[in-house]
Swiss-Prot record:
This is Flocculation protein FLO11. PROSITE patterns: FLO11 (PS51824). It comes from the Eukaryota. Residues 1-22 form the signal peptide.
Length: 839
């Protein structure tokens, strides 16, 4: 009987699924794929383009595969850095790369003309006859990040731009986007309004089997045994208790006497609430299903077959739904802690032509599956509210649509009162992280339009930023570990649970007890919680004891003992509140909770070196430089999943000893050398692996200690300074932009330095001359003669010492000049002036 019911049920389900999804994969006629609005390429600063949808194929529900055709003026393929479709409302993600040097995606061979296939969500038209795509964008980047720059200087268009495709920004019946999105018949059916009715009919046949159950239940009340169990109609009011026995092994109850058929029929009254769903369509009970039951002579078989639909999917779904709420009741609608909502990557506002902004996600609440409600916080430099034309969030991957308008003069939406600072709530799809512990938003954009379409123009002329711009939010365009988007998207723990890897084990644990301990669930608090919704259950909570005292104790003795010899004692354990002992007795589950902890391993590599590109930004410009740094990789294996964590860290200083080198630094301005400096610094050679090849890189670093001369260990023994002598030098003397050549007499002395090692160094030094007069008187009987001599003296020596000990009659000062200087105070002053000029 079990196998026959299984075959019967599977045939019913297969037929229902075939009828429900038989038209899946249908392709719409090309002639019926048309623009959803009229759009003209209003942006004249972008290359001319022709972007359209040329085909659509229905997948399931509101999901379609569409063919996108792209034609535009372009450079060569070697100049292309990246080309991608962003802001998609798609089950496969919000971005599709068609060409990327950074990500190594090369799906096209001609950037001027190409096609690609996209899987997208759609929204229904007002008459429910057509479906329409959500808005999206196509982003193009040229001549950057390793792409060839040949021909880029002659390219008259921007190096980076986005084509906007959509019908969500209408003005005077025309979309302000570059191109429109497209629409086509719903499910690619040309009969508008017919398919929905036919789509409901296959659902009713799937439920038409259930009206057979009420008909069979109506027949069974005709049996005298069913009315004897008058309390069971109250039990049908609580569908869960009987259903769980049905999902338990009551198929073995039919193996007992025919009385189990009565509970099986009494269980059909349990499904009599499910016929309430078909009772919405009472036509089917009036259909030819009732005659079919009289044609079937064996009513017990029909209840058994009617049980099978009850246990086919719907009772199992309640049981599974009762199982799922047990773990989901705890996280149902939980809000993630604010501290655990963090950026999914590092992004710097690289675009300096837009107003400075701070856009982030400040909160997340789990709704269901991969759907979350998030709070977006926006702060940016702005004009007044009266100048705002439109402000909206576009490119969302959301069940409510790809665009949310927060302010629009055209659409009459005024949800904010301060364009410089506001918050809003978004319902979005998310994608799981590699370790399945976190979820992350898909990329999106925030579009701002000022001073147009009826907005005030006061102050617009003084606005230094563009009148229309888009903030890009995402982590899908990484370069050197930094996102090239304006701001990052955010991530948070999956289902807002802080126990990564534990929740799946707890979700598995309830499944294990539910399969083995379903009898406990009737006795446990789950069903009493469900009965609490109906006041009859407290009465029926005692009625299960009455059946235990009635003839049905034989059924537990016959059905439960073979199935639940282990659990037959456990119902007594819950009565004795020994549920804590169940985990103690079933050590397998704690074992399963401990097992994920045992295989967790961590392996950390030594510090190696790598090159990073660091971007330093000032007020309006940014510069990039290569920096050598350390990198470590930690491999973590948990539950069989391996995660590699890369950490950049400073290089250990104790392993590097800089070598002093002389460096010439030249500062340029206006293509001319303005200053050249020679200084000593440290140099370190590093072997760096870049792109798989090893390269020796010299990195300049400050010296940890002062540069020590080679004679640092050699002590000076003696210093001998020679007597000053005179010499003549030639200098250019300039005054008031007029230069002339002058001959200057100056002093020169030599210092002979002898070191303890025996080395000798002679250092010549030019010194100015200082005039000193010394009168030597010679006493004689016949004549007194006075002699005046000009003595060259090193600056800094006292005049008295020069007068007494530095008289050198043998030294002559440049013939023809000394005599004049000796006798003329004016000439001496001139000599001092030249000496000063020389200094």
């Amino acid at each position: 009987m079990v196998s026959l019911r299984s075959i019967f049920t599977s045939s019913i389900l297969a037929a229902g699924l075939t009828r429900a999804h038989g038209s899946s994969g249908k392709t719409c006629p090309t002639s019926e794929v048309s623009p959803a609005c009229y759009a003209n390429q209003w942006e004249t600063t972008f290359p001319p383009s022709d972007i359209k949808i040329t085909g659509a194929t229905w997948v399931q529900d509101n999901i379609y595969d569409v063919t996108l055709s792209y034609e535009a003026e372009s450079l060569e393929l070697e100049n292309l850095t990246e080309l991608k479709i962003i802001g998609l409302n798609s089950p496969t993600g919000g971005t599709k790369l068609v060409w990327s040097l950074n990500s190594k995606v090369y799906d096209i061979d001609n950037p001027a003309k190409w096609t690609t296939t996209l899987r997208v969500y759609t929204k229904s038209s007002a008459d429910d006859c057509y479906v329409e795509m959500y808005p999206f964008q196509i982003q193009v980047d040229w001549c950057e990040a390793g792409a060839s720059t040949d021909g880029c200087s002659a390219w008259k268009w921007p190096k980076s731009y986005d084509y906007d495709i959509g019908c969500d920004n209408m003005q005077d019946g025309v979309s302000r986007k570059h191109h429109p999105v497209y629409k086509w018949p719903k499910k690619c059916s040309s009969d508008c309004g017919v398919e929905p009715t036919t789509s409901d009919e296959p659902e009713e046949p799937t439920t038409s089997e259930e009206p057979v159950e009420p008909t069979s239940s109506d027949e069974e009340p005709t049996t005298s045994e069913e009315p004897t169990t008058s309390e069971e109609p109250e039990e049908p009011t609580t569908s869960d208790e009987p259903e769980e026995p049905t999902t338990s092994e009551e198929p073995e109850e039919p193996t007992t006497s025919e009385e189990p058929e009565e509970p099986t029929t009494s269980e059909e009254p349990t499904t009599s609430e499910e016929p309430e769903e078909p009772t919405s369509s009472d036509e089917e009970p009036t259909t030819s299903d009732e005659p079919e039951e009289p044609t079937t002579s064996d009513e017990p078989e029909e209840p058994t077959t009617s049980e099978e639909p009850t246990t086919s999917e719907e009772p199992e779904e309640p049981t599974t739904s009762s199982e799922e709420p047990t773990p989901s009741e705890e996280p149902e609608g939980p809000t993630c802690p604010t501290s655990e909502v963090s950026p999914a990557c590092y992004a710097d506002q690289w675009e300096t032509t837009f107003p400075p902004s701070d856009i982030k996600i400040t909160g997340a609440t789990w709704v269901e599956d991969n759907i979350y409600d998030v709070t977006l916080s926006y702060e940016a430099e702005s004009l007044e509210l009266e100048n705002l034309t439109e402000l909206k969030i576009i490119g969302l991957n959301s069940p409510t649509g790809g665009t949310k308008v927060v302010w629009s003069l055209n659409s009459g939406i005024y949800d904010i009162d301060n364009p410089a600072k506001w918050t809003t709530t978004l319902r979005v799809y998310t994608k799981s992280s590699a370790d399945d512990c976190y979820v992350e938003m898909y990329p999106f954009q925030i579009q701002v339009d000022w001073c147009e379409a009826g907005a005030s123009t006061d102050g617009c002329s003084a606005w230094k930023w563009p009148k229309s711009y888009d903030y890009d939010i995402g982590c899908d365009n990484m370069q050197d570990g930094v996102s090239r988007k304006h701001h990052p998207v955010y991530k948070w723990p999956k289902k807002c649970s802080s126990n990564c890897g534990v929740e799946p084990t707890t979700s598995d644990e309830p499944e294990e007890p539910t399969t083995s301990e379903e009898p406990e669930e009737p006795t446990t608090s789950e069903e009493p919680e469900e009965p609490t919704s109906s006041d009859e259950e407290p009465t029926t909570s005692e009625e299960p004891e009455e059946p235990t005292t009635s003839d049905e104790p034989e059924e537990p003795t016959t059905s439960e003992e073979p199935e639940e010899p282990t659990t037959s004692e456990e119902p007594e354990e819950p009565t004795t509140s020994e549920e804590p002992e169940e985990p103690t007795t079933s050590d397998e589950e704690p074992g399963t909770t401990e097992e994920p902890l045992v295989p967790t391993t961590k392996t950390e590599t030594d510090v190696s070196t790598t090159l990073l590109t660091v971007t330093d930004c000032g007020t309006k410009t940014c510069t990039k430089s290569l920096v050598i740094t350390g990198v470590t990789k930690e491999t973590v294996t948990t539950h069989g999943k391996t995660t590699v964590i890369t950490t950049y860290c400073p290089l250990p200083t104790e392993t590097v000893t800089p070598t002093p080198v002389t460096v010439t630094s030249t500062i340029y301005a206006d293509e001319s050398v303005t200053k050249t400096t020679v200084y000593t610094t440290g140099a370190v050679e590093k072997t760096v692996t870049v792109g798989g090849s090893s390269t020796v890189v010299v990195v300049h670093t400050p010296l940890t200690t002062a540069v020590v001369q080679s004679q640092s260990t050699d002590e000076i023994k003696t210093v001998v300074t020679a007597r000053p002598s005179t010499t003549t030098i030639v200098r250019d003397v300039c005054y008031n932009s007029v230069c002339s050549v002058a001959t200057i007499v100056t002093g020169v002395t030599e210092k002979t330095i002898t070191f303890s090692t025996g080395s000798i160094t002679v250092v010549p030094t030019y010194v100015p001359l200082v005039e000193s007069e010394e009168h030597q008187r010679t006493a004689s009987t016949s004549e007194t003669r006075a002699t005046s001599v000009v003595v060259p003296t090193v600056v800094g020596q006292s005049s008295s010492a020069s007068a007494t000990s530095s008289i050198f009659p043998s030294v002559t000062i440049h013939e023809g000049v000394a005599n004049t200087v000796k006798n003329s105070m004016i000439s001496g002053a001139v000599a001092l002036l030249f000496n000063a000029l020389f200094l």
